[in-house]
């Protein structure tokens, strides 16, 4: 039984599908959900000639992350469930979303991680990377991958 389920949320349709699956699982097993969104500020620091103020950019990313979590929390609530939310900020290029999700799953501690995957292959996967793949490689608990159709 999965009593504590961490759900990675990024606001994409794939993430929404993962949330739907986590909601079903929580209803069936009486699980507690923790919705986690990772804000990655690192790429903004790669270019010193940014045409915007970094503090404004950081605030915008943080606000967008909060909205994504609020929307996901509302979906959970509409299904008669409750959940906790957690916003994690990455501020250096040495930190990675996958590592932060796995670390949060350990701290909480989750019995299961639910995450959406876009199913990228080839060059797109090489260029864009995969948070889901990084989670699978380093998580100690089971990971449920959900691929949106």
Which functions belong to the PLM regions below?
Residues 39-42, 91, 121:
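Feature marks short, surface-exposed loop/turn motifs that line or immediately flank catalytic pockets
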Residues 3-52, 75-84:
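Small/aliphatic-rich secondary-structure junction motif
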Residues 37, 87-89, 147:
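Residue-level recognition of beta-strand->loop/alpha-helix junctions
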Residues 74-113:
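Structural beta-alpha unit
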Residues 24, 105-149:
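Gly/Ser-rich helix-loop-strand patches that form or flank binding pockets
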Residues 38-67, 100-103:
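Acidic, proline/glycine-rich short linear motifs
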Residues 22, 72, 101, 135:
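Aromatic/hydrophobic pocket-lining residues that form π-stacking "cages" and hydrophobic walls in ligand
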């Amino acid at each position: 039984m999965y009593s504590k389920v961490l759900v990675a949320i990024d606001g994409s349709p794939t993430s929404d599908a993962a949330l739907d699956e986590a909601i079903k699982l929580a209803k069936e097993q009486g699980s507690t959900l923790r919705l986690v969104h990772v804000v990655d500020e690192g790429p903004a620091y790669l270019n010193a000639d940014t045409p915007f103020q970094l503090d404004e950019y950081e605030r915008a990313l943080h606000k967008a992350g909060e909205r994504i979590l609020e929307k996901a929390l509302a979906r959970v609530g509409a299904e008669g469930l409750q959940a906790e939310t957690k916003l994690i900020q990455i501020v250096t290029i040495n930190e990675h979303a996958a590592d932060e999700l796995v670390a949060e799953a350990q701290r909480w501690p989750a019995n299961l991680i639910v995450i959406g995957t876009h199913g990228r292959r080839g060059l797109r996967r090489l260029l864009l990377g995969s948070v889901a793949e990084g989670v699978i490689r380093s998580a100690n608990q089971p990971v449920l991958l959900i691929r949106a159709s």
